[in-house]
Amino acid sequence: MLQEKLTMNRDFLNLINESLLNKYHPAQSRLHEAINYSLSAGGKRIRPLLVLTTLDSLGGNAHDGLPFGIALEMIHTYSLIHDDLPAMDNDDYRRGKLTNHKRFDEATAILAGDALLTDAFQCILNTQLNAEIKLSLINLLSTASGSNGMVYGQMLDMQGEHKTLTLNELERIHIHKTGELIRAAIVSAGIIMNFNDAQIEQLNIIGKNVGLMFQIKDDILDVEGSFENIGKTVGSDLNNDKSTYVSLLGLEASKQLLNDKLTETYDALKTLQPINDNLKTLITYIVERNK
């Protein structure tokens, strides 16, 4: 039933993939080839889907959110390229394919990530949205991805290796490393639609919860998943001696926390009076997915 409902997002997904995969041309340069390699590696596109679906569910024009969604996916992809490098997570596979530095080389992978990060902001500048909204979106994206957002979360994650973290410390890592871009995806819809502060705050609550749920589910899949489904080595977090929700709480308690966060999220979403269930369905997919 859930998969049937998700077919509503197929048009959005096709639009996102078409926009992403037409940005860089592998024949143009080795750099473009490396960028396109990672962009075309078959990700779930959760972040841009959240942008478009939130707009759609709240009565906005989903197409207005496409440039911001593409920018988010570019920054997310750059972060994965860099995270996989030997100096950080030292992973050989991502999404079932060789990681960028394994397929090309470390220097090319670093430059591919650098280019994606830089080009992402150009996506927002090239939109037809008014200047005030563009500035707000650039502020949202830079805050979510920079030294107080995703990059900060990655630093905390590295510092937390080979340590037993408290639950609060673990949540702090994932609010920043995983959660900030997901929060930005959902909040961007409110900025584009000129929501008031109270409405934006509800989107912030939803976005924060969805970000945490995404990570809790990833930690569960690191135990229960398979290489075929998740596209990376099962148990890699345990092998790297990283604290996870499962290692701190246990599997069943992690699943209960996931369900509790989902209930909170549904309650916050109701206050915004969505015109359809598309966002609720996508959030449910994030919690119930097997990859």
Curated annotation (Swiss-Prot):
Q: Which reaction does it catalyse?
A: isopentenyl diphosphate + (2E)-geranyl diphosphate = (2E,6E)-farnesyl diphosphate + diphosphate
Can you cite a GO biological process for this protein? isoprenoid biosynthetic process
Q: Name one GO molecular function term.
A: (2E,6E)-farnesyl diphosphate synthase activity
Question: Pfam families annotated for this entry?
Answer: polyprenyl_synt
Which residues does Mg(2+) 1 bind? 83, 89
Q: Which GO terms describe its cellular component?
A: cytoplasm
Query: Which positions are annotated as binding isopentenyl diphosphate?
Result: 44, 47, 76, 95
Residues binding (2E)-geranyl diphosphate are 94, 177-178, 215, 232
In which broad location class does this protein mainly occur, judging by the first location in its UniProt entry?
cytoplasm
Its cofactor is:
Mg(2+)
Key words of the record: Cytoplasm, Isoprene biosynthesis, Magnesium, Metal-binding, Transferase
Q: How is the cofactor bound?
A: Binds 2 Mg(2+) ions per subunit.
- Entries under InterPro entries matching the protein: Isoprenoid_synthase_dom_sf, Polyprenyl_synt, Polyprenyl_synt_CS, Prenyl_diphosphate_synthase
Q: Where in the cell is it found?
A: Cytoplasm
By sequence similarity, the record places it as follows: Belongs to the FPP/GGPP synthase family.
Protein name according to UniProt: Farnesyl diphosphate synthase
Its taxonomic path starts at: Bacteria, Bacillati, Actinomycetota, Actinomycetes, Micrococcales
